[in-house]
Amino acid sequence: RRDTLRALAGFLDEHPEVGACGCKILDPDGTLQLDSRRGFPSPMAAFCKMSGLSRLFPDHPSISRYHMTYLDPEQTAEVEVLSGSCMMVRKAAMDQVGLLDEDYFMYGEDIDWCYRIHKAGWKIFYVPTTEIIHFRGESGRGAPLRILYRKSQAMSIFVNKHMTRRFRFFPLWLLQVGIALHGIFRFVFKTFRATAMPLADAALVLCGLKLGLAVRYHQE
């Protein structure tokens, strides 16, 4: 929308304690992208997301904490993570925590930035009074395995950078393995779904053709 930058800048002007804010992010079909607002990664959040519990209990604050689906998408709310596709950061916050970490490539840098902003004492807000359309996945189109690798790499960087001390009694390598396996499962599932449906359609067409020919020759 034309007023998006003005709306976000105005929100920062009205709330000096806020270090970053982001708007509602939509798919081209108007569906809300869950990455519009999220919670920080943690072993519990990862388990609930990868096990499917967050989908079964989308309104439970503890179980659906990663995508914060318990929040009303039409209400302004304090969150932990914003999508890098549309995030406005206060200059004072940037001066304090620095810019995006260049160790990340395409994924995870927004989570890392929000974590540092939050840790420095700034608030982070989701502002749905304005919105953008995000054509996600375009940068990685045609390279699914590379994207899977980059996402897993980004989460490994974040875990090693920020979670080693916080969860020092938890075997974080299990979390990294889980993230990698979840990514592989999603890739296999998407590949199967993309190929199975056309093959099923082709099989039905061939069966119909064979049945039609059999009936025709039987009548003759």
Q: Which residue stretches match the model-derived regions?
A:
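Alpha-helical transmembrane segments
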Residues: 197-208
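Juxtamembrane "helix-exit" motif on the non-cytosolic side of transmembrane helices
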Residues: 211-219
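Short, flexible, basic/aromatic active-site loop/helix in glycosyltransferases
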Residues: 40-80
